[in-house]
Design a protein with these regions (language model features):
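ABC ATPase NBD Q-loop/coupling interface
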Residues: 65-82
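Conserved ABC ATPase "signature" region
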Residues: 120-137
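Conserved ABC ATPase signature
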Residues: 142-146, 150
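Conserved catalytic motifs of ABC-family nucleotide-binding domains
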Residues: 163
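Helix-to-loop junction immediately C-terminal to a conserved catalytic motif
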Residues: 56
């Protein structure tokens, strides 16, 4: 892996110099390697949504730098434009991104603006609509006739079709029922496995972060509170709870067991890890 995205001492202040001045992001630095799957978590107001809008130049930082493949995205208009193709952003509410007359035209919008030929655009539209489970007969429909879940699929397909180097997904499961969440989870994992794209998955749900991420960044009051593997982050579960964040249900159970004197490791975050620990505790084999 090599570094594809680098954030260096980034701060963002809204309404500078006014009575409403507010620092939303405070001196944040981190980098993302090519192919990494990163969960970015934090409670409402932690600064995560403001932060991600800098990655492709939608917001300009009050101070600090954003680099894509070693290039400052604000060094020129050309670099800022290139960043918008290199970093795909799916907002929490897909209706913010859908505007064309048909699903096909909406998914094709990004590839068309990249200057791709018609055959390549058509391939990308159809392939990525298939990945997100949209049938051919939907392509000629207006996206505004679709259900919320289908709109989410169209928004994902539109970003997938651009084949960005970095994909940022802001609460992609928000508002979906359990079946819809499972579908979106599967689409994202399939795309990641096929393309090796760097993915930053923004969520307030520790359950989703634990299931999907190989690395978790925790934000609190505009700065990074934690950055590590899921095991490293959930080993500090009590700090997470103090910061107003939840932890996976299985982690919470093991925290309670430890408080009651049971010799368990409360950093578990999957059912499989919990079962293995309980088997060891009983003197059994964790592989049984």
């Amino acid at each position: 892996m090599n570094e594809v995205l680098k954030i260096e001492h980034l701060s963002h202040i809204y309404s500078v110099g006014s009575p409403f001045e507010k620092k939303a992001v405070d001196d944040v630095s981190f980098s993302a390697q090519r192919g990494e799957f990163i969960g970015l978590i934090g409670h409402t107001g932690s600064g995560k949504s403001t932060l991600i809008q800098h990655f492709n130049g939608l917001l300009k930082p009050t101070s600090g730098k954003i680099y894509i493949n070693g290039e400052d995205i604000f060094q020129s208009k050309e670099m800022t434009r290139a960043a918008r193709f290199a970093v795909g952003l799916v907002f929490q509410y897909p209706e913010y991104q859908l505007f064309e007359e048909t699903v096909y035209a909406d998914v094709a919008f990004g590839p068309k603006n990249m200057g791709l030929d018609k055959d390549e655009i058509d391939r990308r539209v159809r392939e990525n609509c298939r990945i997100v489970g949209l049938s051919e007969d939907v392509l000629d429909k207006s996206p505004f006739e679709l259900s919320g879940g289908q709109k989410r699929r169209v928004a994902l397909a539109g970003i997938f079709a651009m084949e960005p180097e970095v994909m940022v997904l802001d609460e992609p499961m928000a508002g979906l029922d359990p079946a819809g969440c499972a579908d979106v989870f599967r689409f994202i994992k399939e795309y990641h496995e096929k393309h090796g794209t760097t993915i930053l998955f923004v969520t307030h749900s520790m359950e989703y972060a634990a299931q999907m991420s190989e690395r978790i960044i925790v934000m609190d009051h505009g700065h990074i509170l934690m950055d590590g593997t899921p095991a490293e982050v959930f080993a500090r579960s009590e700090e997470l709870i103090e910061a107003g964040l939840d932890v996976p249900q299985v982690t919470r159970v093991f925290l309670e067991l430890k408080k009651r004197g049971v010799p368990v490791d409360p950093s578990v975050y999957t059912v499989e890890q919990a079962v293995a620990q309980l088997k060891k505790l009983k003197g059994g084999c964790a592989k049984c």
